[in-house]
Amino acid sequence: MIINHNTSAINASRNNGINAANLSKTQEKLSSGYRINRASDDAAGMGVSGKINAQIRGLSQASRNTSKAINFIQTTEGNLNEVEKVLVRMKELAVQSGNGTYSDADRGSIQIEIEQLTDEINRIADQAQYNQMHMLSNKSASQNVRTAEELGMQPAKINTPASLSGSQASWTLRVHVGANQDEAIAVNIYAANVANLFSGEGAQTAQAAPVQEGVQQEGAQQPAPATAPSQGGVNSPVNVTTTVDANTSLAKIENAIRMISDQRANLGAFQNRLESIKDSTEYAIENLKASYAQIKDATMTDEVVAATTNSILTQSAMAMIAQANQVPQYVLSLLR
């Protein structure tokens, strides 16, 4: 029997340290809910879960961008609906004025209402806003950059001769819909004030190429302001004071109604696409969160079992240390 080195106590102390460390880790997992709390717990798992978490955060912001863009389009479409109602009333008046049974004085009265309705179209276009962004007018599209990033979309006037005839001004709504830099879609929105609805031939076509003008930002596009080329000369007023003018104005009004209807159809199609994107994004987020939880989260039942085991082993090791420390005392009995 030796007394300088109590091997039994040393062995029990070493095992007690191991059990205490394991118990501490298990308690940390139980308190945090995570299986991986630091890279040493699972280096590969930490790396994979970090990338998955970044993708989840990016997709979550993209989903919020999409929701805001849908709200934006719904607001725009609602204002276009009001403009269309006014145009339909103007068409009624133009048809009425074209009737030969009315005198010039009667047509003058009709013209007064026409002018009030054109003012109403301009009022709707000027006051149609979303987060201080003018949706249906020719006003400057420069906005606060931070606001644009939060919305994930930014309006801007564009100079696209290939996409316009007449003098229609427009801007592009660009929405960041994915977790990566290049995942953005855009739609053109044409101004719906009198100057644009009744200018030149009034025809419009879809944009032929993506807008590249401006600086790409995270979640937003900040295009530089520009103007559409004018090919139709001075804007023509809506005049129904004579039969000839009424017929001419009727053609313009019908063309304006067609423009508004086409714009609403385009926005409706774009909204449907955004809703589909949002659904697929939410589904992707759900799957990624499941993968993240599988890698990162702790299985509570397993950790409770491990904590109980390590607690018992720690207490047992402490008891063994106490007993091992009693062995050298037996040497004293030999000296008596």
Curated annotation (Swiss-Prot):
Subcellular location: Periplasmic flagellum; Periplasm
Record field: compositional bias (Low complexity): 210-233
UniProt GO MF annotations: structural molecule activity
InterPro entries xref list: Flag_bb_rod_N, Flagellar_basal_body_rod_CS, Flagellin, Flagellin_C, Flagellin_N
Pfam families, per the entry: Flagellin_C, Flagellin_N, Flg_bb_rod
Gene Ontology cellular component terms for the protein in this record: membrane; periplasmic flagellum
Disordered, as annotated region: 208-236
Self-association and partners: The flagellum consists of an outer layer composed of repeating units of FlaA around a core that contains several antigenically related polypeptides.
The protein's role, per its UniProt record: Component of the core of the flagella.
Family to which the UniProt record says this protein belongs: Belongs to the bacterial flagellin family.
Record-given protein name: Flagellar filament 41 kDa core protein
UniProt organism field: Borreliella burgdorferi (strain ATCC 35210 / DSM 4680 / CIP 102532 / B31) (Borrelia burgdorferi)
Gene behind the chain: fla
